[in-house]
Curated annotation (Swiss-Prot):
Cystine connections: C310-C390, C350-C374, C352-C357, C406-C425, C417-C435, C419-C430, C429-C452, C443-C449, C448-C473, C461-C480
Annotated Ca(2+) 1 binding sites: E202, D286, C390, N393
An example Gene Ontology CC term for this record: plasma membrane
Provenance organism: Bothriechis lateralis (Side-striped palm pitviper)
Record-listed Pyrrolidone carboxylic acid (Glu) modification sites: E191
Record domain Peptidase M12B: where: 199-395
Stored SUPFAM superfamilies: Blood coagulation inhibitor (disintegrin), Metalloproteases ('zincins'), catalytic domain
Protein name: Zinc metalloproteinase-disintegrin BlatH1
Tissues with expression: Expressed by the venom gland.
Location of the motif TDN-tripeptide: 465-467
């Protein structure tokens, strides 16, 4: 059994606050300076890895003490993770770097049930956490005193421009995509798919040549950026019981391998074709995302095909590197992957707890890391009705998933649910003491699902439109049937 290492960091704030400073995230108007002081308590005889499996950080925010719990994201990389870049003469260079002892964590604030966090501890502490409903960012200060860190609210980062940033998707009817086949070809029944809690997306990210030049040919800087983005993606998708495993990172360091243009739809089409004819033949994966340094026409910052996950040509998205804040890039990539998983743009009736949700068509000044209730339903329908077989298999190597810890609000192997400690659990379907669903649970979501049970037969689940009749639940399924 893996020994869990407990690390306490005391962050002592300096007796002053900064008024304005230029950080990696941009110009920050108000920040606190803190100093990490690390105190390690190791069990006797335990070897000390470079990066511990679990850590705690104690510090003050706005004068109030908080405790940040961190747990290493052991599902970040697949066992066969690889990286590819190209020499100046076009030769492909592929390596399998050791990534088991990495430095990327998920976290939460103690006694704050709604808190989340995504932190890298590679060179100091860098990332974000949510405290009492507000997002804070932390990063090392580039001073002669290497221990100094800045903590600041996301709202205090000066916005780069006032122009809206939007998804380029306009088609929201997945049935219009002819190549997508129905789930009748799947080996699993719809009910087996519904109650198989884990889904695994094996992801490839490609950084184009403009990304390479934008970061001055620094491969390590691009790697770190993408690792941080994928770590945040996992934080966002875990509430859908989806794990994102990075299986390959490709950097077009010599030249672009497709025609990357400012017309987002054309670039998406070219990237999908390249994935099917080139990438898939040398690296097995479920989905590929292109991160590009180009500025797309108009307000578009990303685009993807809808309900296309597992399709060789269509399971792709493209994202513009539009911000210095990696969280915003991750929100955009999560949005495009959401389209791949059957999600459409949110309407005014969609909610995720008072925030602008991930599938909002326009990137908000205060973006959320949560999917809306509409997205949950649309994703559920995709799993039931589309050929989603590829995301039902676990990536290579069971050791990429950490041993389950019931009550940490992270769904892990062997658990059917994890809603936190019993006093904080908000999931009526989940037994917080065992992290198993109650034996009487029939469903978790759907228009004909209420309090974990199928709604009674005859219950109206969709009102009539035009000459149609009301749609009514059957009492045997969580889905609202059509009258056809």
């Amino acid at each position: 059994m893996i020994q869990v290492l407990l690390v306490t960091i005391c962050l002592a704030a300096l007796p002053y606050q900064g008024s304005s400073i230029i950080l990696e995230s941009g110009n920050v108007n108000d920040y606190e300076v803190v100093y990490p002081r690390k105190v390690t308590a190791l069990p006797k005889g335990a070897g000390q890895p470079k990066y511990e499996d679990a850590m705690q950080y104690e510090f003050k925010v706005n004068g109030e003490p908080v405790v940040l719990h961190l747990e290493k994201n052991k599902g970040l990389f697949s066992k066969d993770y690889s990286e590819t870049h190209y020499s100046s003469d076009g030769r492909k260079i592929t390596t399998n770097p050791p990534v088991e002892d990495h430095c990327y964590y998920h976290g939460r604030i103690e006694n704050d049930a709604d808190s989340t966090g995504s932190i890298s501890a590679c060179n100091g502490l860098k990332g974000h956490f949510k405290l009492q409903g507000e997002m804070y960012l932390i990063e090392p200060l580039k001073l002669s005193d290497s221990e100094a860190h800045a903590i600041y609210k996301y709202e205090n980062v000066e916005k780069e421009d006032e122009a809206p940033k939007m998804c380029g998707v306009t088609e929201t009817n997945w049935e219009s995509y002819e190549p997508i086949k129905k789930a009748s070809q799947s080996n699993l029944t719809p009910e087996q798919q519904r109650f198989n809690p884990f889904k695994y997306v094996e992801l490839v990210i490609v950084a184009d040549h403009r990304m390479f030049t934008k970061y001055n040919g620094d491969l390590e800087k691009i790697r770190i950026k993408i690792y941080e983005i994928v770590n945040i993606l996992n934080e966002m998708f875990r509430y859908l019981y989806i794990r994102i495993a990075l299986v390959d990172l490709e950097i077009w360091s010599n030249r672009d391998l497709i025609n990357v243009t400012s017309v987002a739809g054309d670039t998406l089409d070219s990237f999908g074709n390249w994935r099917e004819t080139d990438l898939l033949k040398r690296k097995s994966h479920d989905n590929a995302q292109l991160l590009t340094g180009i500025d797309f026409n108009g307000t578009t910052i990303g685009i993807a095909y809808i309900a296309s996950m597992c399709n060789p040509y269509l399971s792709v998205g493209i994202v513009q590197d539009h911000s210095e804040i990696n969280f915003l890039i991750a929100v955009t990539m999560a949005h495009e992957m959401g389209h791949n998983l059957g999600m459409r743009h949110d309407t005014d009736y969609c909610t995720c707890g008072g925030y602008s949700c991930i599938m909002c068509a326009v990137l908000s000044d205060q973006p959320s890391k949560f999917f809306s209730n509409c997205s949950y339903i649309q994703y559920g329908k995709f799993i039931m009705n589309q050929n989603s077989q590829c995301i039902l298999n676990e990536p290579l190597g069971t050791d990429i998933v950490s041993p389950p810890v019931c009550g940490n609000e992270i769904l892990e192997v062997g658990e059917e649910c994890d809603c936190g400690c019993p006093t904080n659990c908000q999931d009526p379907c989940c037994n917080a003491a065992t992290c198993k669903q109650y034996s009487w649970v029939q469903c978790e979501s759907g228009e004909c699902c209420e309090q974990c049970r199928f709604r009674a037969a005859g219950t109206v689940c969709r009102r009539a439109t035009d000459n149609d009749m009301d749609n009514r639940c059957t009492g045997q399924s969580a889905d609202c049937p059509s009258n056809g």
